[in-house]
Structure formats: C-alpha cells, structure tokens
Amino acid sequence: MAHVIYDNFYLSNEVEDQFNSHLNLQTFCTVDNSLVGTAGMKRRINVYQATNGTEKLAMGEGNTKSIEVSYAEKEYEVLLAQNKFEYFDEQAMTDSMLVPVGTRHMGTDMFNHVNADIFAEFKKASLSHPTAVFDFAAFVDAQALMNLENLEGVSIFGFVCPADMAKIRKALKDDLKYVEAFAKAGYVGTVGGVNLYTKKDATAGEIIIATRDAVTLFNKKGTEIEQPPRSADDANIRKNTIISRKYYLAALTDATKAVKITLTA
C-alpha cells in the first residue's frame, strides 16, 4: 500500500483540509431515518413541482397564466456508500498519525459523498429566475416563485460560491444583514429573508435558494463500521482493514420549494 509516511521525529503533524465543502447539507433538508432495505432496492417517491407564473405587465394588462402545481411519481434506488482503509502493523508503529488520519478521512470522504448527492438534488430545481445582477430584487423575486402563503417560521436559505459571494457583497452593501440566529459554518448574511451560505463547490453564476422541504434524505440511521478479523494470509503479513458503509438516498421531493437564480450577464 502506497501510504506516504514519515518517521515521527520532531515533526509537527499537519492534516490537510480534505472537505469539498464544510457545509453540512443534512441540516438543510428533511431527514427521514425510516429507510430500510439494501443497495439497489427501489423506492417510489411523489415529487411535487410548479410552473412559473410571474409576468411583467403594462397598465391595463393582466396575467395570461397562473402557477400550476403537480406531482409525478419517480423511482429512486437505495444507495450504498462504502469505503475502506488498509494498513500494516509496521506502518502504524512507524507513524502514530497514520491510523487517526486514515480513519478520520473515512468519515470526511463519506461526508463529501453524501453531501454531493444531496446538492445534486437541489440542482435539479426546475423553477428559475434569471437576473443581470445578484441584487435585493433578484432574491425577493426568486422567493416569490415558491408561492409561500405564510412566511412565518419558514427558513429560506441560499447556496453561493465564494466568487459570487464577493459580487453579492458589493451589490447589496447595507441590504446584506447578519442575523445571529442563523449563524453556522458558511453563513454570510441575510437578504430579503434569504439566509446566504458560502459553499465552495457551488456553481459560479448560479444561486440555489430553497427550504428544507425541497430535498429529503432517506437514511438508514447510522454509519456501519466494520473491522473484520484478519485472515490467515493477512495475519501473516500483518495487514489490517477497516470498512465503513452507509445506506441512503437523497431526493428532490418538493420542487416548488427550490429556485435557481441564474446570472445572465
């Protein structure tokens, strides 16, 4: 195994940042821990969506269309995410950081993997609002597409890449407010009722705003950790294996609660 190790001798241990994004998307979706079954099993889910209905009108004109809500049954497959870490006794004895860093990255890698699938579902949002600039009006107009009757108690959030966040700060200035109640990793500020979070792997020129109802993570609770007993062959060469696995599926279950704000210029 090609681990890069060192003789632990008067060296400080620096661990590289290996998270694709520190933003835990499980806190931004509905988590359903009732998932049962095994990898490859099918699950049918009703996915709700709505058509756009906002129009710019002149005096005396009225809307020619209205927002329509519908649902479609979609079939999802239960996923199994698994990784393994292998090392030899001699490697662990030579470098005391090998096993802690390796096992920690098992969790990091699993986190990145599940996060990517959740974000992929947010990116399926069918409602969109094009804008020439990420200004106050853009966030208010995009929020209106969700057609929420009562905003009380509803938390709307937005995922923004770092480059676009700089543009937003310049465009919004005093309209970007910092609300202590929403402070968590990545939180930058709130505009027009939308809490903005920096996500370093978000797409440039595209901001996704949503509520927790948009995406559901169906989760078989807990991550399984297995360290199988060594076979005779592995024992002979002093080889160890640790395995972690997780069963889950992420689904855009309510497309009426997610909107893409896309930059046109």
What are these regions (language model features)?
Residues 1-71:
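N-terminal "assembly arms/tails" that initiate or stabilize quaternary assembly
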Residues 36-39, 199-204, 230-238:
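Short, ordered beta-strand-loop transition motifs
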Residues 41-43, 83, 154-156, 192-194, ...:
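Structural beta-strand/beta-sheet cores of well-ordered domains, especially the beta-sheet scaffolds
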Residues 53-56, 167-170, 251-253:
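Short helix/loop capping segments that flank catalytic or ligand/cofactor-binding pockets
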Residues 82, 86-153, 260-265:
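Alpha-helical scaffold segments that mediate packing/assembly in large oligomeric complexes
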Residues 140, 144-224, 236:
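Extended oligomerization regions of viral-like shell subunits
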Residues 230-265:
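Extended, compositionally biased alpha-helical segments that mediate assembly or anchoring
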